[in-house]
């Protein structure tokens, strides 16, 4: 069974087979083998989880789509030769096992009366197909999710599953129960969230949320009793020096006030810890005597002491 790294490494080892595919260069221009392997994995995972078969693509008149079909076919042949499976192929095999074997499907359905799925906004197409396949005609399915927290699109998840869920049932069959009380977050965070969703909707951002979320306003479980604000704005313009300085001052204020007993109580969340903006902030903090732990940032070999040792 291949995890994400194993999968990419397997493609990397066989990159010559993919590069020999006709019109390969249309889909993946010249580049490093590792990057091409990563792109191939993304393509085959997304196609597989949408239940797309290679033959469907290979017969297309569009050369790039036909090339994608050949890439998917080659990838599956490599899996078969090595008797290997990845996460997407597990889902595919499960789907076909149930779809093509009525006895097995009926036996499973006889043991399942209700299906409950949490974090439904993070499910993909094939997972929804499996859920409805197992539920059968009864469709006793309960799903819980938040369309504003659809974070796993990069792994094939689609927000359409939760937005269009009621449409999978006849009129009156699907009951929607809004869960608008937030028991986890400080009321200041909840208020900021509501203001943010309102502010980003409309002409200013050239975007309308109405097609991508259920209309709602979240309420905090209780009003915050903290004297300190839960949400702080540290930069108003795209000025790196101002951003660095404000963050440093904010951390120092937390430490001096006793709200921090150790700098390791501070965590930063970024899309990528390797982004130049992020590594620049880390270097700035370390220059100001605040150590940063970020093992995936590739900063290790940039440290003076490591360069001297090498």
Q: What feature does the model see in each segment?
A:
Residues 1, 6, 10-14, 130-133, ...:
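Alpha-helical scaffold elements adjacent to nucleotide-binding pockets in ATP/GTP-utilizing enzyme cores
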Residues 1-3, 15-31, 54-60, 78-83, ...:
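Short, polar/flexible loop-turn hinges at active-site or ligand-entry regions and domain interfaces
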Residues 1-93, 102, 110, 139:
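A basic/glycine-biased coupling hinge at the interface between accessory DNA-binding modules
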Residues 7, 83, 87-90, 185, ...:
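Phosphate/oxyanion-binding active-site loops and adjacent basic polyanion-contact surfaces
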Residues 98-115, 136-137:
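Short basic/glycine-enriched coil/helix segment immediately N-terminal to the Walker B
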Residues 108-125, 142:
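SF2 helicase catalytic motif II
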Residues 125-234:
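Conserved RecA-like helicase ATPase core segment
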Residues 245, 252, 256-310:
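Core RecA-like ATPase module of SF1/SF2 helicases and allied nucleic-acid translocases
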